[in-house]
Amino acid sequence: LPSQTIHSIESPIGWTAVEGELRQRLQRCDNLLRRKACLSAREEGVQGLRSLARALDVRQGGFECEPALDQAIVALDEALDFTNSAEHNGSLGSTSEIVATHQTDVLRSYDLTNVSPDIAAQHYRAFARDRLIMTTQDHPWGADVLYAIGKSYEFESETDNAAKRASYENAVVFYHAALRINPSQTDAANQLGYMLLHLDRTEEAEQALVHAYQTKPSVTIAQNLMELYRRQGNQSAMSWSANQIASFQTPESNAVPQVQSLSPREFMQISPQIAAGQPAAQSSVQVASTNRTSEPKASFGTSAATTSLAPAPKKPNFATGFFNKMFRK
């Protein structure tokens, strides 16, 4: 039989309806996170992402977005096998043996003889991040949903000590994907830096936090930068951060904080140059310190105001704003 192309015979669901469903799911996600129901909150986020993916697939006349979401979910689940292998001293099999049992084929064509489980897991998470971006087709609504799912992992890290590192790493995947889709999403950049600080990946944390501060300065981001530079032992940068924090707290700056404007090059010049592989000063400080004042501060809201989301005929480019009053402790 000759192959035939199947086309849609009904008009696709309108963007207003898609928006309404996403708002409902994000609100339920927020309510569940307030009750520390992280898994249920995450499921709401994933289902919202699936609804967006299906709407995009129908409009594009293909089937790429939803399968990409499924591939991302599977890759993150399978990445845990490498973590479990490391915790069991490799008793679950070698890296190549573990990869052979997986659906994710990102490493299947490589010689994995000398590849550690942790490195393999890194590639799985990178693959998942790219598939999440493919799922949304760079749709800004997707960035909001990815941010919410990242929040579920961040909250999980606060309640489940056994899975703390995996929760940090998965939160990084979703925050990073959200930021790639919408570079102006300040909260995603700040939370990405916050999670990277927990993993002591200070150079990457600096990139995220500097980007967040340059996008929209806030006292929360300045506090995170203060903690970052404290760990690096960078006294001049700590002094700069302290001045920025003070500028938000002075009575004269209640309306508009007096924040010094720096170019990216000027900003980075105040940071230390750390050679590759050289540990930063004070990098052994634990995030989970009992001294709460020295911890990085997490921001649980969005800086974006709620906006009216108008539909577009083909590839929409909507403003974000689902999180105006959500995700606040």
Model features per residue range: what roles?
Residues 46, 53, 140, 183, ...:
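Short coil turns that delineate tetratricopeptide repeat
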Residues 122-130, 162-177, 199-210, 234-242:
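Structural signature of tandem alpha-helical TPR/SEL1-like repeats
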Residues 48, 135, 177-178, 211-212, ...:
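Canonical positions in the second alpha-helix
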Residues 20-27, 49, 55-115, 126-129, ...:
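Amphipathic alpha-helical repeat scaffolds of TPR domains
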Residues 2-8, 67-107, 232-242, 250-255, ...:
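Alpha-helical linker/edge segments of TPR/alpha-solenoid repeat scaffolds
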Residues 25, 32, 44, 51, ...:
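Alpha-helical solenoid repeat scaffolds, predominantly canonical TPR units
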Residues 59-61, 147-148, 187-191, 220-226, ...:
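Alpha-solenoid helical repeat scaffolds
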Residues 32, 153-156, 160, 196, ...:
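Residue at a conserved register position within TPR or TPR-like alpha-solenoid repeats
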